[in-house]
Curated annotation (Swiss-Prot):
It is found in: Cell membrane. SMART domains: HDc, KH. This is Ribonuclease Y. Residues 212-272 form the KH domain. Its EC number is 3.1.-.-. The lineage of its organism: Bacteria, Pseudomonadati, Planctomycetota, Planctomycetia, Pirellulales. It is a single-pass membrane protein.
Length: 522
């Protein structure tokens, strides 16, 4: 081998191992440094954890001390409060003991005073007994002396004295009652007049007067013959379909429809006008026209009922009630349209209710429905108050509304104030001038009844009904009747009217006692 090459190889191996040794030494040095760094970091983490643990431990100790101090302070306060309560209880107990001792002392004093009073009272009772015995002796002596002087016994004198006292008392009572009646009458009349006038002035209504017949114009007499038909078949078919009487006489241009049922009469009138306008008049056409007119009248009835309810601001009515309300448009009472009368009563009752602090809406509802029974009294038994009350009860109306319909003519005991309001409004609507009219025979009979009732009473000389029966003037004798007796006669006559007569509004009774003294100068 070449010595130079071998030397070169040796040098190369030497430096190679030397490099490896250097690298290993470097790696070892880096590993040592990393381990030292990790040890330092671990030491730092341990130190930080140790410091944090110390800090938390100190905080826990501080919190525990604060809680302990708070608990101790609370316990101290409770102990102090209990001590204070105990002291207050002790003071109250001491005060009550003092009061008890004082009360016992007062009781002993009162007992001593009572014993002293009983002793004095016993002495006074003995004196009083002696004085009473002496007084009885003196009274007996006086009675014997009075009986001897007057010639009357004790019983006779007492009876005469009682009669005198009774007469004086009756005179005083009559004067007092008369005075208070006049004052009360003035106040009540003034308040009632103001309330009624205010309500009536705030509302004014138009009333229509209907009869039991309706007239229908015909263009020619030939049309009358067509209405009658061959052998009267058309008129018989018409009367059978409508339930009314058709009167055809010599009156030119007029045919009269007569019937007591206003709804049927209106259906007949409308049907006849349609037949005359159409010109075709035969039984089948009559039946068709009457059926159509009946439907139109039914719709008109519902419309009238809804209009009346809306006019007085009443809502929530049953369909049957609205229908019956609309039927009142065709009903009259003493020539007064019942539907307009019901609307007027509703307004008057509502205004009066609001004046005295009641529910105006409920009063208007009661007033509107009070005469609802008049629309069905031809179909059911009983008077219209009972029929109307039954209908409203079945329609789920309030008790106030049902009672107002049943009792607005004073036929039952009044349970609700709305019944009296409706009765008052009903009387106002019926009795105002021009609202109703009655026959001459009925008018004369009512005047005679008023005068005959007044003539029943002793001391009445003459009686005159004036102002269309709204007032009665009674003349009494001044020798037979005193002022107090005249006032009693006036009350009795008014009470008799209320019990025996039925009348709208009120009747004023005036008793006149006149004394005349005549002398002649010569």
């Amino acid at each position: 081998m070449n010595p130079q090459l071998a030397s070169t190889i040796l040098y190369c191996l030497f430096f190679f191992f030397l490099g490896i040794a250097a690298v290993l030494a470097f790696i070892q040095r880096q590993a040592v440094k990393r381990r030292e760094r990790l040890d330092a970091e671990a030491e730092a983490v341990l130190e930080s954890a140790r410091r944090e643990a110390e800090t938390r431990g100190n905080q826990i100790i501080v919190d525990a001390r604060e809680k302990a101090l708070a608990i101790k302070a609370e316990a101290d306060r409770e102990v102090a409060a209990m001590r204070e309560t105990e002291q207050i209880r002790d003071r109250k107990l001491d005060a009550r003991e003092d009061q008890l001792a004082s009360g016992q002392e007062s009781l002993r004093k009162a007992q001593r005073g009572l014993e002293s009073s009983q002793t004095r009272l016993a002495a006074q009772m003995r004196n009083l007994t002696e004085q009473r015995a002496e007084l009885d002796r003196l009274v007996q002596e006086s009675q014997r002396a009075l009986e001897k002087v007057s010639g009357m016994t004790q019983e006779e004198a007492a009876e005469k004295l009682m009669q005198s006292l009774r007469q004086d008392l009756e005179h005083e009572i009559g004067s007092t009652v008369l005075k208070h009646q006049r004052e009360l009458g003035r106040r009540v009349d003034a308040q009632a007049r103001e309330m009624l006038l205010t309500a009536m002035q705030r509302y004014a209504s138009v009333h229509t007067a209907d009869t039991t017949t309706s007239t229908v114009g015909v263009p020619t007499d030939d049309m009358k013959g067509r209405i009658i038909g061959r052998e009267g078949r058309n008129i018989r078919a018409f009367e059978k379909a409508t339930g009314v009487d058709l009167i055809i006489d010599d009156t030119p241009g007029v045919v009269v429809v007569s019937g007591f049922d206003p709804v049927r009469r209106e259906v007949a009138r409308m049907s006849l006008e349609k037949l005359i306008a159409d010109g075709r008049i035969h039984p089948s056409k009559i039946e068709e026209t009457v059926e159509q007119a009946g439907k139109e009248i039914q719709a008109f009835i519902l419309q009238k009922g809804q209009e009346a309810a809306g006019e007085v601001n009443v809502s929530g009515l049953h369909d049957r009630v609205i229908e019956m309300l609309g039927r009142l448009h065709f009903r009259t009472s003493y020539s007064q349209n019942v539907l307009r009368h019901s609307v007027e009563v509703a307004f008057l009752a509502g205004m009066m209710a609001e004046m005295i602090g009641l529910d105006g809406d409920l009063a208007r509802r009661c007033g509107l429905l009070h005469d609802i029974g008049k629309a069905a009294d031809h179909e059911l038994e009983g008077g219209h108050p009972k029929i109307g009350a039954d209908l409203l009860r079945r329609s789920k109306e309030n008790d106030e509304v049902v009672h107002a319909a049943k009792g607005h003519h004073d036929e039952i005991v009044t349970e609700f104030p709305y019944t009296m309001l409706v009765a008052t409004a009903d009387a106002c609507s019926a009795s105002r001038p021009g609202a109703r009219r009655e026959s001459l025979e009925r008018y004369v009979k009512r005047m005679e009844e008023l005068e005959s009732i007044a003539q029943r009473f002793d001391g009445v000389q003459q009686a005159y009904a004036i102002s269309a029966g709204r007032e009665l003037r009674v003349m009494v004798g001044s020798q037979q009747v005193s002022d107090e007796r005249a006032a009693a006669i006036c009350r009795d006559i008014a009470s008799t009217f209320e019990k025996e007569l039925t009348y709208p509004g009120e009747i004023k009774v005036t008793v006149v006692r006149e004394a005349r003294f005549t002398n002649t100068a010569k």
